[in-house]
């Protein structure tokens, strides 16, 4: 059982908690009553506010709607007035723009274009809203007038500011200073920048609103004229400077540039001196070879210390008469080569300018028309060169082909740039340069073939043969012609390849090359073809010289003649690069000529047999020293002395006037002859030393061995 005290305490505790809970409950009940009262008050206030708000809305909304309507009406009135003003302005456009249109766009292009824009809008308005109004005709006429003045301004700006490019600037553009390690790109400015921007602006307007292409015709006509004038100015520059060597071009100072492995130089390269020399000499032979003159026109090679005996060079008078023409020819060729490069550079510059002014879909056609005049003039000049060469070749003047070589080489070097520049033009335009190249290759190959045939078939003329047996002019001119080919090896080889395809010379094509076009044969094949051609010319020359030598009645002179010519050919081949070029296909050409030279020396030495045979031991009886000779035996010895003396004197007299220009060969021949004759003569004298065959020995023993050697030393020397 729970103790009584604890129960009482517990009871009191519970009663106290109950009392507290009752007090809390009473507080909550009072709070709820107050909250209900506040809620009822708030609901009453909100209900009153809503009622008043509805009353206010009912009074304000009608006023708002009325105000909104009034504002809309005001806006409509303003828009109507604005539109009326705008429409009325169209009726005044003609009057407002009259002064500016009449004065034209010069000096105020953008203001003028703004006026044109106003007129155009007026035209569009009347066309859409009142097509029958007289105002439409007025603004239309004003618009057409404005467009005409814009086109006139376009023409005026182009004409006024388009100037030919100065020749010096063109030469800088196509070549630059080759002495400079870093070449700066030369920019050709055809129009001032401000003028160019005006022209571009006018062009853009005419394209968009002008609705015609007349301005494009104007553009190509004006620029075409300036392009042609620029090229003609370059030609005139060369002509004016032809009297000096200081032309702004490296052509006259440049050494040979083209080899089969070297890259072509950037600036056109031409070697006037070699062409002029070759043409001078070859023309003299081809045109005056039948006038009775003889000898070679070629300057002696190293080792030929005397002028070739019997050679008649061009007289000063004759040379002076032709020198001017040769200089003109040099300038014309150099000029044409540079004009081709100038055309490409100027055409590239013109196209760059054109792309800023002419619409893209009209650019190629306009460019095609723009370049036609200058291109046609260049092609016509090239055709004239070909025609002149063709006429010269018909006259057997094969030196004319030397004019074609530098031009053809440059045309082929320029062709890639030419094709790239003319990309997109008409086929007839793009084919003009290839057609000229083909024409030059055809006439050049024909000239080379006919030259080879002419060497073989050159007639044997006694009066045209050198009396002293020196180098024949056919030899010197043939070698000179071949030496000129060294400057144009790739060009000449490709020229032959493009025409004969190797069949003429039995050179097989590489299978990889057989499908290529004629203009794309490998450099190696062209070099082989040229090597074979040169060997063919040398073979024809050798055959012709053998035939010509038969004109000489004296076998010794015949041998000297062939010796001189063969030696000259060999020396020329060795001095130039011809020997290496021929060796491409024929390895033993040098040894062949040395054998021929040695053979002719031996043939010449046989002429001395009629001298030394008198000293031969046959028919000479055995003599005993101090023995008395019979009359017949004495006469034999006398006849041998007399035969030797007369033969020696006769040969020395005749052969003294002959020529062996090569000092080394001359000394070799003399030395060999001295050795043979002197030994034979000394042996004969020694045998007859103690024999008394005459009372006057000095009558028969005229020359000592030393004197004989001295006489032989004076052979081939007219001054001795």
Curated annotation (Swiss-Prot):
GO terms for biological process: exocytosis; protein transport. Keywords: Cell membrane, Coiled coil, Cytoplasm, Exocytosis, Membrane, Phosphoprotein, Protein transport, Transport. The keyword Cell membrane applies. It is found in: Cytoplasm, Cytosol; Cell membrane; Midbody, Midbody ring. The modification Phosphoserine is found at residue 133. It is a peripheral membrane protein. It comes from the Eukaryota. Residues 249-268 are annotated as: Disordered. Residues 5-34, 63-83 form a coiled coil. One of its GO terms (cellular component) is exocyst. One of its GO terms (molecular function) is phosphatidylinositol-4,5-bisphosphate binding. Component of the exocyst complex involved in the docking of exocytic vesicles with fusion sites on the plasma membrane. It is required for neuron survival and plays an essential role in telencephalon development. Belongs to the EXO70 family. The C-terminus is required for translocation to the plasma membrane. This is Exocyst complex component 7. It comes from Danio rerio (Zebrafish). The lineage of its organism: Eukaryota, Metazoa, Chordata, Craniata, Vertebrata. The gene is exoc7.
């Amino acid at each position: 059982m729970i103790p009584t005290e604890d129960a009482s305490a517990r009871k009191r505790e519970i009663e106290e908690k109950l009392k507290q809970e009752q007090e809390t409950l009473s507080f909550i009940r009072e709070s709820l009553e107050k909250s209900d009262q506040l809620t009822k008050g708030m609901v009453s206030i909100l209900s009153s506010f809503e009622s008043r708000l509805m009353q206010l809305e009912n009074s304000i909304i009608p006023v708002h709607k009325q105000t909104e309507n009034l504002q809309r009406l005001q806006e409509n009135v303003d828009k109507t007035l604005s539109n009326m003003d705008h429409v009325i302005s169209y009726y005044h456009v003609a009057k407002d723009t009259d002064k500016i249109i009449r004065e034209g766009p010069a000096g105020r292009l953008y203001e003028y274009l703004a006026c044109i824009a106003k007129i155009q809008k007026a035209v569009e308005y009347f066309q859409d809203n009142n097509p029958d109004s007289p105002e439409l005709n007025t603004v239309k006429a004003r618009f057409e007038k404005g467009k005409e003045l814009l086109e006139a301004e376009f023409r005026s700006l182009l004409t006024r500011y388009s100037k030919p490019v100065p020749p010096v600037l063109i030469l800088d553009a196509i070549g630059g200073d080759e002495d400079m390690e870093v070449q700066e790109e030369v920019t050709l400015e055809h129009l001032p920048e401000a003028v160019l921007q005006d022209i571009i602006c006018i062009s853009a307007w005419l394209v968009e609103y002008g609705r015609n292409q007349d301005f494009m015709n104007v553009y190509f006509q004006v620029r075409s004229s300036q392009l042609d004038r620029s090229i003609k100015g370059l030609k005139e520059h060369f002509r004016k400077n032809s009297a000096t060597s200081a032309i702004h071009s490296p052509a006259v100072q440049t050494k040979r540039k083209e080899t089969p492995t070297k890259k072509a130089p950037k600036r056109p390269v031409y070697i006037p001196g070699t062409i002029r020399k070759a043409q001078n000499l070859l023309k003299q032979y081809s045109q005056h070879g039948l006038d009775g003159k003889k000898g070679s026109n070629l300057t002696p090679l190293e080792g030929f210390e005397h002028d070739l005996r019997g050679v008649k060079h061009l007289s000063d008078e004759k040379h002076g008469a032709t020198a001017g023409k040769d200089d003109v020819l040099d300038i014309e060729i150099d000029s044409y080569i540079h004009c081709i490069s100038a055309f490409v550079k100027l055409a590239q510059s013109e196209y760059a300018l054109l792309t800023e002014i002419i619409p893209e879909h009209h650019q190629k056609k306009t460019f095609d028309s723009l370049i036609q005049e200058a291109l046609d003039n260049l092609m016509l000049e090239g055709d004239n060169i070909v025609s002149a060469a063709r006429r010269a070749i018909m006259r057997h003047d094969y030196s004319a082909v030397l004019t074609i070589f530098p031009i053809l080489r440059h045309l082929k070097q320029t062709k890639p740039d030419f094709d790239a520049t003319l990309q997109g033009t008409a086929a007839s335009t793009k084919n003009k340069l290839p057609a000229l190249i083909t024409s030059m290759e055809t006439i050049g190959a024909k000239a080379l073939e006919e030259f080879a045939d002419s060497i073989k078939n050159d007639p044997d003329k006694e009066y045209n043969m050198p009396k002293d047996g020196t180098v024949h002019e056919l030899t010197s001119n043939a070698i000179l012609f071949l030496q000129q080919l060294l400057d144009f090896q790739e060009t000449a080889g490709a020229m032959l390849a493009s025409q004969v395809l190797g069949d003429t010379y039995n050179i097989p094509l590489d299978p990889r090359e057989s499908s290529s076009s004629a203009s794309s044969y490998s450099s190696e094949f062209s070099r082989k073809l040229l090597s074979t051609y040169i060997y063919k010319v040398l073979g024809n020359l050798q055959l012709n010289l053998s035939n010509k030598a038969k004109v000489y009645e004296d076998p010794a002179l015949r041998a000297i003649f062939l010796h001189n010519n063969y030696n000259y050919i060999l020396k020329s081949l060795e001095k130039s690069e011809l020997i290496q070029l021929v060796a491409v296909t024929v390895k033993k050409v040098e040894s062949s000529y040395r054998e021929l030279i040695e053979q002719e020396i031996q043939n010449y030495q046989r002429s001395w047999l009629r001298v030394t045979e008198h000293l031969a031991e046959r028919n000479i009886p055995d003599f005993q020293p101090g023995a008395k000779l019979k009359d017949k035996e004495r006469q034999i010895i006398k006849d041998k002395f007399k035969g030797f003396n007369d033969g020696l004197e006769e040969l020395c007299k005749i052969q003294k006037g002959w020529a062996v220009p090569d000092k080394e060969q001359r000394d070799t021949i003399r030395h060999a002859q001295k050795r043979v004759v002197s030994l034979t003569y000394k042996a004969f004298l020694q045998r007859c030393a103690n024999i008394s065959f005459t009372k006057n020995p000095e009558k028969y023993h005229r020359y000592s061995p030393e004197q004989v050697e001295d006489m032989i030393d004076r052979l081939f020397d007219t001054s001795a």
